[in-house]
UniProtKB/Swiss-Prot annotation:
Keywords: 4Fe-4S, Cytoplasm, Iron, Iron-sulfur, Metal-binding, S-adenosyl-L-methionine, Transferase. Residues 87-305 form the Radical SAM core domain. [4Fe-4S] cluster 1 binds at residues 76, 81, 87, 316. Pathway: Protein modification; protein lipoylation via endogenous pathway; protein N(6)-(lipoyl)lysine from octanoyl-[acyl-carrier-protein]: step 2/2. [4Fe-4S] cluster 2 binds at residues 102, 106, 109. Residues 1-23 are annotated as: Disordered. One of its GO terms (cellular component) is cytoplasm. One of its GO terms (molecular function) is 4 iron, 4 sulfur cluster binding. This is Lipoyl synthase. SMART domains: Elp3 (SM00729). It comes from Burkholderia pseudomallei (strain K96243). Its EC number is 2.8.1.8. The keyword Protease does not apply. The keyword Metal-binding applies.
Amino acid sequence: MTDLTATPAPAEPAASAYDPTAKQKAQAKTARIPIKIVPIEKLKKPEWIRVKAATGSSRFNEIKTILREHNLHTVCEEASCPNIGECFGKGTATFMIMGDKCTRRCPFCDVGHGRPDPLDADEPKNLARTIAALKLKYVVITSVDRDDLRDGGAGHFVECIREVREQSPATRIEILTPDFRGRLDRALAILNAAPPDVMNHNLETVPRLYKEARPGSDYAHSLKLLKDFKALHPDVATKSGLMVGLGETTDEILQVMRDLRAHDVDMLTIGQYLQPSEHHLPVREYVHPDTFKMYEEEAYKMGFTHAAVGAMVRSSYHADLQAHGAGVV
């Protein structure tokens, strides 16, 4: 006789507890920000968006191996940069210090969020050894946001700069910093001990989109960081970068460019925003090459010493060539 007794459904697994020390990516990261990401119909990539796939070239594999051996991170990997294949293949990388967990949750960015680990005291020496081993003549050093540190990580930047210059005195150093919000004066005073060859801090987008795209950041504060650094170090080139395609207007981008020049910023990058995953902010427009060309022309009219503008341009993409064009190297 058939047993018609219903079998109880298995109990739903309990929701896993939030672990602030875990590295959160994609949905786990963006689910906890106050701004809800509303999906829109995905735009078809136009023909001018072409990414060179990461390859297994010997140079590509050599860099990845050396990075792992020295327990180092690159923003190329952590932020899923579309140019990683080209850059690694040519022996260049943007080093990301102070760990791989950011204290911010910017929904355009693919770097993981979480409670950061303690600073690695060996990282400056490991970084310098890696740069020397790779015989790099120009390096970019960036970091996650470290709102947990009293100096925002400025002291660690200084230690890295000192170690690189000790082991590779001919190497030019660009730093791409967080905003040091709430600790700007302290951070700038610390950076006085070892200023870089190029000081880069990205505005990322227009002020109207800050609440959506850069929660925890402030447009006016970022401009002040750049201007205050330049006032302290007039001979050091300053630089900033923007993404387009998030819903900004052309006039808004041009106004940001004017704001940058009014705050004594020398160099500019503008590139197309590409959505890292469906859980990140959507692409609202693929900006036409003609518009990028217009931005470039306007940048030089405004007095920027160098402007790298184009769909696949990123803040540190061909940074050595950008610096050379601006007369830094």
